[in-house]
A protein has these predicted regions:
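Binding-site signature for planar aromatic cofactors or substrates
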Residues: 2-135
Length: 135
C-alpha cells in the first residue's frame, strides 16, 4: 500500500467505538481509585503504562513525549526522569503538566492535569539502581 493511497483514504478511516458510555453513577468517587480499577483491567502485553507527558516552557513551548507510569500514589502518578533532561528542566521552570493514557483495546483515554513534584532523592536513587546501566 503506497502513501498516496493511505493519505487519500485517511479521512474515511474510522473505528466505531461501541464499548459503552461512561456513566458517572458507575464511577468511583475517587479519581485515583477509578484509575486503578481501569488500570488493573489492562493486559501487560503492550506498554499499558505508557502515557504522554506534556510540559511547557517559554523557550520551548509545549513539548510532548511518552514516559512510563511507574507507580500510583494516593496523591498522584509517578514517573522517573533524569534531572538534567529537557522535561525535567521544563517541569522545574513550570510544574503544570498534563498526562494522557490511551488504551485503544478498551476504547478509553484518561487525561490528567496537575502539578509535577520531585519524589524523594532516596526513592529516585532506589529506582535508578534497578535499571540497566545504559537504559
Amino acid at each position: 500500500m503506497d502513501n498516496y493511497f493511505i493519505m487519500n483514504k485517511i479521512e474515511n478511516f474510522r473505528i466505531n467505538y461501541n464499548l459503552g458510555a461512561l456513566r458517572r453513577k458507575n464511577l468511583s468517587p475517587s479519581p485515583i481509585n477509578q484509575f486503578k480499577l481501569w488500570f488493573n483491567e489492562l493486559s501487560p502485553e503492550y506498554d499499558f503504562n505508557a502515557m504522554v507527558l506534556s510540559t511547557y516552557s517559554k523557550l520551548d513551548g509545549v513539548q510532548n513525549r511518552v514516559v512510563l507510569l511507574k507507580d500510583i500514589k494516593r496523591d498522584g502518578f509517578v514517573f522517573y526522569t533524569n534531572y538534567n533532561s529537557l522535561k525535567s528542566r521544563q517541569i522545574e521552570s513550570n510544574n503544570n503538566v498534563s498526562i494522557c493514557f490511551f488504551w485503544p483495546d478498551r476504547q478509553r483515554q484518561v487525561r490528567v492535569n496537575g502539578k509535577a513534584y520531585k519524589i524523594s532523592n532516596q526513592a529516585s536513587i532506589k529506582y535508578f539502581k534497578k535499571r540497566p546501566r545504559k537504559s
